[in-house]
Structures are given as C-alpha cells and as structure tokens.
Amino acid sequence: CILGFLLFTGAALQQIGLIYTTAGKSGFITALYIVLVPIISLIFGNALRLSHIIGCITAVTGVYFLSFTGSYDAVNAGDVLTLAGALFWTLHIVTVSRFVRYHDGLKLSIGQFFICGFLNFAAMILVGEPLTPAIITAAAWPIIYCAVFSTGIGFTFQILGQKGVPPTEASLICSLEMVFSLLSGYIILNERLTLWEIAGVILMSIGIVAAQLPSRTVYGRREIPEKS
C-alpha cells in the first residue's frame, strides 16, 4: 500500500508541476532525488561513503547539463510541486530498499501496481475527468504501454534489483532514464545532441561509476540488503 501511494503521489505531483514549469526544469528538479536519497537513507542506518558524495555531485551536474535550455525563469508553483514530487520519489526508493529485505519483491510489485492504479482511477473520478468510449479508445494504447512497460515491468525490475543494491547507488542508476531517453531520441527520432547534452551524459556516467568504487565511510555503517 505504501509503495503504491508513494509512486502515485510522486508521479502525480510531477505531472501537475509540468503544467506550470518547463520540461527542462522539471527533469532537473525531479532528478534531485539523487541527492535526497543518501540524506534520507542515513535515517535508516545506511552508510554514506565518500564515493557516494562524489558520484552524486557529478551526476547532478550532468543532469543540469542535460536539462539546461539556456536560461531558467524564477521559481514558480510548478517548481514547488515538482520538488515535492522528487521527495516522494526519494521516499519510494528508500522504502523499497527497506521492504524488499523482508518481503518478496514480486508480491511488493503486484501490490504497488494495483494500489497505484486504484489511486489514479479514483483521482480521475474526483477531478471530474469525462470517461467516454471515444476517450477510452484514444487513450487505450498509451495507458496500456505505461501500465505494462513502465509501471509493471520497469518498477518490478527496480524492486527486484534493489534487493542487492544500496539505495544511494539505486537512485543513481534510476537517473539513467534521462540518458536513455536522450539516446533513444538520437537513434530513433534522429534528434541532434548538443555539446551540453553530450557533456551531461558523460558526467552522469562518470558519477554512477564513481559511486560504485570502494572508499572510506563518511557517516554510518554500510548496510547492504541481503541477496536471495
């Protein structure tokens, strides 16, 4: 129940925020979970290594390069909503790391899937969104794609993978979605990469690799989830 609620709230706040802010700012603010995850993880007893700090700073810099569009406007309501969404994404990653140690990952994913779906359906009714056959037909394939590939398969792999990966490193790996979307646009849609975007991809890759390297513990005692 908790995972489904966190997933729904994070996604909802991010999508509502996009109404008022730009895609570039939204992407950068959302990716701040890279920094928030290691901070929140300290509360649950996870260790913070020097390599984590270096990796997070490098990756966030890379995200900035990827999302930078030349100029940013002043902070608006959309930015605040997106930041709140980033906090819920952070809690989702940290909570998964805790729950997957004691519960079956597949069962967690199934529960998350149905709770998130129910909350989305309830939200649609509450906001008075019309539900006609024409709308259902038009939105059927996008909904099926998001439900099966993104929520169903994607988040299931995340939960199963986090059984053997500390939350800080998991957050860095999850942030690669920006890199994959950029490269997919380049390969499939023939979009051109700017020097900023290329630099961002390189920095994010360096940051993720750096976080995996052994280094001294800055705070706490390293706690790795048990492997099945």
Predicted regions, residues:
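Loop-to-transmembrane-helix transition segments
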Residues: 1-13, 77-85, 133-153, 174
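Specific transmembrane alpha-helical segments of multi-pass solute transporters/efflux pumps
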Residues: 1-30, 65, 147-165
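Helix-helix packing/entry segments at the starts of transmembrane helices
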Residues: 26-32, 96-118, 151-187
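C-terminal transmembrane-helix exit sites in multi-pass transporters
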Residues: 33-54, 179-198
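Transmembrane alpha-helical segments that form core, pore/gating elements
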Residues: 36-38, 56, 74-128, 143, ...
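Hydrophobic transmembrane alpha-helices of multi-pass small-molecule transport proteins
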Residues: 48-68, 86, 120, 196-215
